[in-house]
Protein backbone atom coordinates (compact mmCIF):
# COMPACT_ATOMS: atom_id res chain seq x y z
CA UNK A 1 0.00 0.00 0.00
CA UNK A 2 2.93 2.37 0.68
CA UNK A 3 4.22 2.10 -2.90
CA UNK A 4 0.69 2.87 -4.08
CA UNK A 5 0.57 6.11 -2.03
CA UNK A 6 4.05 7.02 -3.24
CA UNK A 7 2.69 6.64 -6.78
CA UNK A 8 -0.09 9.11 -5.96
CA UNK A 9 2.45 11.55 -4.45
CA UNK A 10 4.57 11.20 -7.58
CA UNK A 11 1.59 12.10 -9.79
CA UNK A 12 0.93 15.16 -7.61
CA UNK A 13 4.56 16.23 -7.99
CA UNK A 14 4.27 15.80 -11.76
CA UNK A 15 1.09 17.93 -11.81
CA UNK A 16 2.67 20.84 -9.91
CA UNK A 17 5.53 20.84 -12.42
CA UNK A 18 2.94 22.27 -14.85
CA UNK A 19 0.51 23.99 -12.50
CA UNK A 20 -0.48 23.62 -8.85
CA UNK A 21 -3.86 21.87 -8.63
CA UNK A 22 -6.68 24.00 -7.24
CA UNK A 23 -7.86 20.88 -5.41
CA UNK A 24 -6.26 17.47 -4.87
CA UNK A 25 -8.11 14.82 -2.84
CA UNK A 26 -6.52 11.42 -2.22
CA UNK A 27 -8.85 8.41 -2.44
CA UNK A 28 -12.14 10.33 -2.22
CA UNK A 29 -15.18 8.18 -1.40
CA UNK A 30 -18.32 8.23 -3.54
CA UNK A 31 -20.30 5.24 -2.26
CA UNK A 32 -19.85 1.47 -2.41
CA UNK A 33 -21.31 0.97 -5.91
CA UNK A 34 -19.26 3.74 -7.46
CA UNK A 35 -15.65 4.15 -8.49
CA UNK A 36 -12.78 4.54 -6.05
CA UNK A 37 -10.30 6.85 -7.79
CA UNK A 38 -6.81 7.26 -6.36
CA UNK A 39 -7.27 11.02 -6.56
CA UNK A 40 -9.64 13.73 -7.64
CA UNK A 41 -8.13 16.98 -8.80
CA UNK A 42 -9.01 20.26 -10.37
CA UNK A 43 -6.00 21.02 -12.49
CA UNK A 44 -5.60 23.53 -15.27
CA UNK A 45 -9.24 24.53 -14.68
CA UNK A 46 -10.49 21.00 -15.41
CA UNK A 47 -11.75 18.24 -13.09
CA UNK A 48 -10.02 14.84 -13.27
CA UNK A 49 -10.38 11.49 -11.59
CA UNK A 50 -6.91 9.95 -11.48
CA UNK A 51 -6.17 6.24 -11.39
CA UNK A 52 -2.56 5.24 -10.73
CA UNK A 53 -2.19 1.72 -12.16
CA UNK A 54 1.20 0.27 -11.32
CA UNK A 55 -0.13 -3.29 -11.56
CA UNK A 56 -1.35 -4.88 -14.77
CA UNK A 57 -5.04 -5.78 -14.70
CA UNK A 58 -7.23 -7.79 -17.03
CA UNK A 59 -9.46 -6.03 -19.56
CA UNK A 60 -12.49 -7.20 -17.54
CA UNK A 61 -11.24 -5.67 -14.28
CA UNK A 62 -10.46 -2.39 -16.03
CA UNK A 63 -13.84 -2.33 -17.78
CA UNK A 64 -15.51 -3.04 -14.41
CA UNK A 65 -13.68 0.00 -13.04
CA UNK A 66 -14.99 2.13 -15.91
CA UNK A 67 -18.50 0.73 -15.41
CA UNK A 68 -18.44 2.08 -11.83
CA UNK A 69 -17.66 5.53 -13.25
CA UNK A 70 -20.57 5.04 -15.67
CA UNK A 71 -22.88 4.25 -12.76
CA UNK A 72 -21.81 7.43 -11.00
CA UNK A 73 -22.25 9.39 -14.24
CA UNK A 74 -25.84 8.16 -14.63
CA UNK A 75 -26.64 8.79 -10.94
CA UNK A 76 -26.10 12.52 -11.56
CA UNK A 77 -24.90 12.83 -7.95
CA UNK A 78 -21.82 14.57 -9.35
CA UNK A 79 -24.03 17.57 -10.18
CA UNK A 80 -24.01 18.34 -6.44
CA UNK A 81 -20.24 18.36 -5.93
CA UNK A 82 -19.03 21.55 -4.23
CA UNK A 83 -16.50 22.24 -6.99
CA UNK A 84 -19.13 22.32 -9.75
CA UNK A 85 -19.60 25.75 -11.36
CA UNK A 86 -22.98 27.40 -10.79
CA UNK A 87 -24.27 27.44 -14.35
CA UNK A 88 -23.12 24.24 -16.01
CA UNK A 89 -22.16 20.80 -14.77
CA UNK A 90 -19.04 18.92 -15.84
CA UNK A 91 -18.27 15.25 -15.35
CA UNK A 92 -14.54 14.88 -14.69
CA UNK A 93 -12.24 13.28 -17.23
CA UNK A 94 -10.60 10.03 -16.16
CA UNK A 95 -6.81 9.97 -16.35
CA UNK A 96 -5.24 6.54 -15.96
CA UNK A 97 -1.51 6.65 -15.28
CA UNK A 98 -0.33 3.29 -16.58
CA UNK A 99 2.46 1.69 -18.56
CA UNK A 100 -0.07 -0.58 -20.25
CA UNK A 101 -2.71 0.74 -22.66
CA UNK A 102 -6.07 -0.81 -21.82
CA UNK A 103 -8.77 -1.53 -24.37
CA UNK A 104 -11.56 0.14 -22.43
CA UNK A 105 -14.31 2.38 -23.65
CA UNK A 106 -17.28 4.46 -22.68
CA UNK A 107 -19.63 6.59 -24.73
CA UNK A 108 -20.21 8.98 -21.80
CA UNK A 109 -16.75 9.44 -20.31
CA UNK A 110 -13.51 11.07 -21.45
CA UNK A 111 -10.77 8.57 -20.67
CA UNK A 112 -7.08 9.30 -21.09
CA UNK A 113 -4.25 6.82 -20.59
CA UNK A 114 -0.61 7.82 -20.26
CA UNK A 115 2.50 6.56 -18.49
CA UNK A 116 3.14 9.98 -16.88
CA UNK A 117 1.75 13.50 -16.70
CA UNK A 118 4.36 14.69 -19.21
CA UNK A 119 3.26 11.97 -21.68
CA UNK A 120 -0.35 13.05 -21.07
CA UNK A 121 0.61 16.67 -21.80
CA UNK A 122 2.44 15.54 -24.96
CA UNK A 123 -0.68 13.70 -26.12
CA UNK A 124 -2.69 16.93 -25.77
CA UNK A 125 -0.17 19.07 -27.62
CA UNK A 126 -1.31 20.15 -31.06
CA UNK A 127 0.63 18.24 -33.67
CA UNK A 128 2.06 20.67 -36.26
Per-region residue spans from a language model:
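Charged, structured surface patches that assemble and position nucleic-acid processing machinery
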Residues: 108-128
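Short, solvent-exposed polar/charged micro-motifs at secondary-structure junctions
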Residues: 32-36, 105, 123
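Solvent-exposed, charged helical/coil patches
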Residues: 1-17
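Active-site metal-binding core of divalent-cation-utilizing nuclease and nuclease-like domains
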Residues: 12-48, 54-64
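Conserved beta-strand termini and adjacent loop/short-helix elements that scaffold enzyme active sites
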Residues: 26-29, 97-99, 114
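Catalytic cores of nucleic-acid endonucleases
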Residues: 54-111
Amino acid sequence: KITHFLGIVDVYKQLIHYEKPKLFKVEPKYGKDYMEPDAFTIWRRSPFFIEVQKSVYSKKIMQDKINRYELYFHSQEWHNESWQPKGSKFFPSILIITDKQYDINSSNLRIFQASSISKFMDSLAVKA
